[in-house]
């Protein structure tokens, strides 16, 4: 998905949203990519009573909201400013909101109609495990105590279904209510890209609100999985970290879990899927364990579920060999090899020098013997030569 700047909507309350002299203002940041955005109020000087809710990804774009509770004022000059920054698109937006008392006359407040309905995909593990039941979830938030119950309708590829399970609405920390409906679905319906629609209706809504979701379109690509043991710098601490790197997969729906000697481990954290420049995704998972448990030789396994994998599952294990430190062992082996090499070189040089000395001594002895023989032969031949000269006529 390409970088998309957010649209920012100021949310002013109606009279029902006010409690005594306090009023809650909101700021909706919609349709941006990628994360993150930052939301502050009055450039950060207003921090009390601020609640910023997690971003929700829908149709490859993010939406989040932030609210602040402030004293109400009939004076329009007293404004509150919502400051939104989206670094990825270099976007900065400031929206002013006037906390007016809607009960006064002749003041008439108009509140923009903003959807409070969200739809969520099934968990990847539920989709890829045949014994589990995947569910698409529809959530309605910020329901007033005086609002009537909401009604949910569900559609699969525009065909209405009646198998959803709707929970009783629950009161939230800010005295509003939340209502949730879950639709159990078939594993293959999600994997095959069917479209799921949630329609919400209430007497408090001017019209029904619809939200639609389906699996990200595109050819699945299996992830590459790598496990990384603790770095030697961590071995001086009581706890060490094991890392699992999962790269080059598509779509982003993935489940990463850890096991310890075949049993589920709990003390791990996963990053959210992060998009590569080629459109694939990668994830890191970190498992913290006691150093003593690592040094005891226990087996730790990184388990990955993704639709691109054969049987949708793969895993990689790692364990510590007692007394083995890779860097130290390599260094010791290298030192041993060097010592052995120098010993071999020394012996070779010594034997070479001895061979040269021996050859030189033998050669010298032979030369001396030959020279002596030649001299002796010469002395024998000279008198005979002289006698032959004297006998000549």
Curated annotation (Swiss-Prot):
Gene3D superfamilies xrefs: Immunoglobulins
Any Pfam family the entry gives: C1-set
PROSITE patterns: IG_LIKE
Residues the record marks as carrying a glycan: 174
Chain segments carrying region CH2: 111-217
InterPro entries per record: Ig-like_dom, Ig-like_dom_sf, Ig-like_fold, Ig_C1-set, Immune_Resp_Modulators
Keyword set includes Disulfide bond: yes
Membrane topology: Single-pass membrane protein
Region annotation (Hinge) ranges: 98-110
Cystines in this chain: 27-82, 138-198, 244-302
Region annotated CH3, chain positions: 218-324
A single MF term (Gene Ontology): immunoglobulin receptor binding
Location of the protein in the cell: Cell membrane
Cytoplasmic topological domain residue ranges: 358-393
Region described as CH1: spans on this chain: 1-97
GO biological process: antibacterial humoral response; antibody-dependent cellular cytotoxicity; B cell differentiation; complement activation, classical pathway; defense response to bacterium; humoral immune response mediated by circulating immunoglobulin; immunoglobulin mediated immune response; phagocytosis, engulfment
Matching CDD domains: IgC1_CH1_IgEG, IgC1_CH3_IgAGD_CH4_IgAEM
Alphabetic keyword roster: Cell membrane, Disulfide bond, Glycoprotein, Immunoglobulin domain, Membrane, Transmembrane, Transmembrane helix
Keyword Acyltransferase: no
Annotated GO CC locations: cytoplasm; external side of plasma membrane; extracellular space; immunoglobulin complex, circulating
TM region(s), chain numbering: 340-357
Protein name: Ig gamma-1 chain C region, membrane-bound form
Originating species: Mus musculus
């Amino acid at each position: 998905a390409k970088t998309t700047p957010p649209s920012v909507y100021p949310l002013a309350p109606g009279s029902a949203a006010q409690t005594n002299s306090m009023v809650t203002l909101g700021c909706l940041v919609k349709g941006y990519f990628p994360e993150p955005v930052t939301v502050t109020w009055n450039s950060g000087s207003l921090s009390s009573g601020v609640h910023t809710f997690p971003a929700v990804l829908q149709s490859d774009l993010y939406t989040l909201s932030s609210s602040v509770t402030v004293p109400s004022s009939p004076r329009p000059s007293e404004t509150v400013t919502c400051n939104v920054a989206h670094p990825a698109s270099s976007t900065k937006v400031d929206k002013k909101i006037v906390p007016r008392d809607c009960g006064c006359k002749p003041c008439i407040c108009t509140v923009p109609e903003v959807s409070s309905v969200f739809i969520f995909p099934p968990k990847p593990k539920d989709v890829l495990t045949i014994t589990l039941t995947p569910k698409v979830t529809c959530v309605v938030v910020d329901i007033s105590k005086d609002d009537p119950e909401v009604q949910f309708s569900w559609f699969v590829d525009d065909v209405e279904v009646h198998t959803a399970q709707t929970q009783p609405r629950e009161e939230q920390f800010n005295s509003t209510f939340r209502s949730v409906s879950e639709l159990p679905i078939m594993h293959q319906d999600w994997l095959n890209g069917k479209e799921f629609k949630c329609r919400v209706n209430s007497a408090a809504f001017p019209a029904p609100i619809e939200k639609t979701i389906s699996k990200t379109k595109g050819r699945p690509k299996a992830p590459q999985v790598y496990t990384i043991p603790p770095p030697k710098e961590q071995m001086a601490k009581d706890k060490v970290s094991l890392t699992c790197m999962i790269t080059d997969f598509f779509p982003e729906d993935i489940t990463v879990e850890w096991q310890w000697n075949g049993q589920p481990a709990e003390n791990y954290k996963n990053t959210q899927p992060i998009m590569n420049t080629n459109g694939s995704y990668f994830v890191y998972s970190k498992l913290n364990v006691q150093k003593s448990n690592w040094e005891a030789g226990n087996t730790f396994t990184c388990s990955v579920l993704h639709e691109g994998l054969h049987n949708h599952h793969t895993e990689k294990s790692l364990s510590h060999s007692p007394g083995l430190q890779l860097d130290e062992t390599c260094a010791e082996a290298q030192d041993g090899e060097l010592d052995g090499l120098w010993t071999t070189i020394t012996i070779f040089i010594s034997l070479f020098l001895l061979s040269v000395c021996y050859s030189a001594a033998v050669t010298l002895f032979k030369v001396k013997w030959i020279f002596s023989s030649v001299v002796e032969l010469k002395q024998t031949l000279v008198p005979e030569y002289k006698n032959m000269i004297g006998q000549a006529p």
